[in-house]
């Protein structure tokens, strides 16, 4: 979910802004600086190889603001993604990680979203709480990550709701476009009555589904054991403070455009007054 700095430019003003001074009067053209991004080539609404995801478009927006362009390394988002990409030096930026993610240095958040209930609009469930008694009998679909369960599945299990819950792999069938969309498709077909999914994913595919689907945010349980909301940031290597600072400045500068982009993709946004989330537990990350 970077800019590649060279020691030879340290004595110059930033190349992406002005170019270096020279001893000749001829005008100099600053070379473009690459924002090297590692991303999943088949993971809409976040990213794909055609550049159709909102993280693709955000990366382009930031690179353009820095006077450069995006260079991608494509890598399926699986266990070990950060280790095999960012930490291995294949790129300088990964988009879409929880703010405070422990395996990297993270930027300021650029949005905050929530898990949501997703159901067919004609059912009129209008669910909000995991303690709603109807969840004991409704057929529920959730994303799963291998042997790991995301927060909704854990909270349902804590309430003894397991027998009527079906798991859909967040990885899906990678041979097909948009593998995570299988959960939304299950709701539209009527295979499950309601799904609990990460809001950005659900919002994007719900607007394209037929019949119409209804989406409502999941209320945060009173015990607070598993968060339902997350602030999302970008990851850089732990020692790359300079790049983080530049990305932070660009995120602040592009705030209105970023909000408009997220709304265009149907991302349900949650107000975030602090934009400074503490480090989040690795097991409590949104599934995507």
Predicted region positions:
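Short loop->beta-strand "edge-of-pocket" segments that line small-molecule binding or catalytic clefts
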Residues: 34-48, 130-159
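C-terminal motif of bacterial Sec signal peptides marking the signal peptidase cleavage site
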Residues: 16-19
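Ligand-binding clefts/hinges and TM-proximal coupling segments of bilobed small-molecule sensing domains
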Residues: 22-23, 69, 147-172, 248-288
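Alpha-to-beta junction loops
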Residues: 68-69, 87-96, 137-139, 182-183, ...
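Extended ligand-binding regions for polar small-molecule ligands
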Residues: 21, 53-66, 121-124, 131-147, ...
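Periplasmic-binding protein-like
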Residues: 40-43, 112-116, 122-124, 167-170, ...
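Acidic, polar ligand-binding/catalytic clefts
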Residues: 60, 64, 69-135, 144-148, ...
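Extracytoplasmic small-molecule ligand-binding "clamshell" domains
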Residues: 22-103, 174-177, 264-268
């Amino acid at each position: 979910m970077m800019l590649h700095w060279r020691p030879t430019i340290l004595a110059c003003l930033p190349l992406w802004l002005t170019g270096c001074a020279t001893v000749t009067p001829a005008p100099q053209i600053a070379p473009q600086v690459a924002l090297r991004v590692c991303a999943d080539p088949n993971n809409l609404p976040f990213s794909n190889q055609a550049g159709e995801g909102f993280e693709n478009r955000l990366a382009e927006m930031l690179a353009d603001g820095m006077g450069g362009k995006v260079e991608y390394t494509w890598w399926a988002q699986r266990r070990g993604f950060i280790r095999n990409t960012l930490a291995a030096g294949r790129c300088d930026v990964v988009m879409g990680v929880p703010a405070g993610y422990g395996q990297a240095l993270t930027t300021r958040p650029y949005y905050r979203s929530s898990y949501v209930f997703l159901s067919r609009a004609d059912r009129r469930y209008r669910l909000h709480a995991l303690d709603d008694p109807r969840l004991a009998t409704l057929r529920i679909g959730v994303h799963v990550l291998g042997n790991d369960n995301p927060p909704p599945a854990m909270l349902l299990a804590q309430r003894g709701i397991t027998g009527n819950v079906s798991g859909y792999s967040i990885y899906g069938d990678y041979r097909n476009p948009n593998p995570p969309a299988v959960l939304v498709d299950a709701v539209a077909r009527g295979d499950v009555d309601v799904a609990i999914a990460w809001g950005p994913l659900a919002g994007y595919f719900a607007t394209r589904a037929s019949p119409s689907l209804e989406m409502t945010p999941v209320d945060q349980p009173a015990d607070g054991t598993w968060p339902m909301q997350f602030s999302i940031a970008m990851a850089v290597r732990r020692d790359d403070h300079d790049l983080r600072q530049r990305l932070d400045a660009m995120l602040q500068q592009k705030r209105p455009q970023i909000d408009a982009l997220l709304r265009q993709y149907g991302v349900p946004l949650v107000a975030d007054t602090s934009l400074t989330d503490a480090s989040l537990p690795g097991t409590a990350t949104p599934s995507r």
